[in-house]
């Protein structure tokens, strides 16, 4: 599996102060009213587990989150925020854990957290998220990408269950591919998402949207993560043609979806 970073992001403000090991969390922004603000939030989990692992009950961690990444879209918002909390708080505590210990802690929070903790863009991921190999090819760097937001929320465990997988996938662990082709067209031809069929069966609107966008032939259309977000890469790596952008804008406008332009970092 190839994971890449894009320009869409949330904003975190994190402070440490003397205390009793409490985690104080607040959130605003996109969809914040629908996202857990207790231990069900990966940011809170990351802070609590780091306090427990380092036995630092003499500090409180204050976290403020401004959401821009839609929840339940498969964009890794929760996992990337958890990784950011781990990294920032761990550094503020004087880096008491070594790299391996911190990576294990990250994996205990979520399968995608180690990837975001690593901080590299193009990474081939295998196992249950612990096998990471940086892909140093330039296949996708700086490539523009369109994101389709506004489709119904899909929970990762539900999609995995529909696909017949455990979310931990102990019985289907695969070694990561060490690299992907540098030729852009060949790379596009290899892009697929094994969870798309399951996610589409749970969300008819996702299935309809993917089919309609592919019929427009404006680029390579795929589903992000476990859904329900959709991405479109240009047929030509130099960028999207004006007529393709107009088609995408018209489709999203007529279907009450949000079209966001970003790029791969």
Describe every region a protein language model picked out:
Residues 1-73, 91-100, 149:
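ATP-binding N-lobe of GHMP and related small-molecule kinases
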Residues 12-14, 43, 78, 147-148, ...:
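Residue-level signal for inorganic ion chemistry
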């Amino acid at each position: 599996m190839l994971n890449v970073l894009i320009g869409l992001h949330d904003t975190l403000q994190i402070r440490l102060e003397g205390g009793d090991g409490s985690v104080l969390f607040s959130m605003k922004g996109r969809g914040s009213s629908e996202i857990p603000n207790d231990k069900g939030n990966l940011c809170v989990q990351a802070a609590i587990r780091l306090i427990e692992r380092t036995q630092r009950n003499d500090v409180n961690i204050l976290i403020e989150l401004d959401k821009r990444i839609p929840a339940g879209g498969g964009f890794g918002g929760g996992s990337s925020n958890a990784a950011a909390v781990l990294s920032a708080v761990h550094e503020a505590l004087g880096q008491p854990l070594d790299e391996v210990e911190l990576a294990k802690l990250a994996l205990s929070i979520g399968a995608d957290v180690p990837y975001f903790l690593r901080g590299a863009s193009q990474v081939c991921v295998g196992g249950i998220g612990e096998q990471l190999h940086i892909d140093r090819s330039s296949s996708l760097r700086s490539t523009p990408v369109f994101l389709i937001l506004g489709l119904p929320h899909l929970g990762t465990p539900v999609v995995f269950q529909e696909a017949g997988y455990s979310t931990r996938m102990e019985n289907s662990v695969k070694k990561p591919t060490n690299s992907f082709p540098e030729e852009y067209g060949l790379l596009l031809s290899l892009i697929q998402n094994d969870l798309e069929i399951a996610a589409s069966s749970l969300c008819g609107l996702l299935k309809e949207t993917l089919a309609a966008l592919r019929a427009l032939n404006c680029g390579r259309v795929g589903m992000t993560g476990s859904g329900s977000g959709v991405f479109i890469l240009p047929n030509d790596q130099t960028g999207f043609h004006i007529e393709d952008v107009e088609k995408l804008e018209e489709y999203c406008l007529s279907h009450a979806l949000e079209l966001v332009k970003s790029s791969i970092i």
